[in-house]
């Protein structure tokens, strides 16, 4: 089963889609938009084109596990996604994904504008990889 993960942001939203078996990240993209409706419509288009059957969305949590200050904004966007796509997003803990994405890009000599254009897609890939690992470890 294909799964899509997103790293929602004010100006850029990273997208990662698994391979057909749901084992690893297959493709990534970045949606450039400051308008939640436009972002949600683009996610819907990508869901349809990819055939993804599940949507995972990074959700902000503090290091102690409580909801972060932007949680209500993310919940509102998740509700908008469900309304537009007909698919309820799974809210997935995104703690440290952007930090890890920056580290990965630094180690691979991505700097400046090149890094800015890639960090959201890498963060979405990390969200997806975390979710896929969870599924592998919790098979019934």
Language-model segments: residues:
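Phosphate- and other anionic-substrate recognition elements at nucleic-acid/protein interfaces
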Residues: 2-3, 10-140
